Amino acid sequence: AVGDGGLSHEETTAWVHQFQPDCFAGYNHGAPSGRLSLRERGCAGPLGGDNLTWVEDAGKNEKAYDGYLVAEFTYPLLPPHEGGADWFYSLPQHDSLVFPAEKIYKDYKEAVEYGNIFSLNIGPDYNGNIREIDCKVLREVGRMIKENK
């Protein structure tokens, strides 16, 4: 979402915690606050690690702020491409694009290693359905996880 409703991150965290004291609020850029380090388009790694997100100030803030209890990293299942959206459904010419199951499984294993939360963004198509290619890759990742416990 764009905008902050007129509150700083610290004020927003305090506002959220008045209703849900144990909530893991976090922000992907700007002043650090909350308990959750958000690494948008980032990667797995320890709290306070270097170069774990594309957001320059987020990495610096993670090192300087000791309130984080856990880190999440996230990226869209749709790999980089020309034109169209990344985080939501893109364009029909990108319907065959998806990160390979091997990459997602590797990132999953690293998230487990560091105790990170790993989130994938999967946007529906124009009909509101998850693309079949995404389902296929996610089923393969699930198989890899089950077979390598």
Q: What does each of the following model-derived ranges do?
A:
Residues A1-K149:
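Mature catalytic domains of secreted/periplasmic carbohydrate-active enzymes
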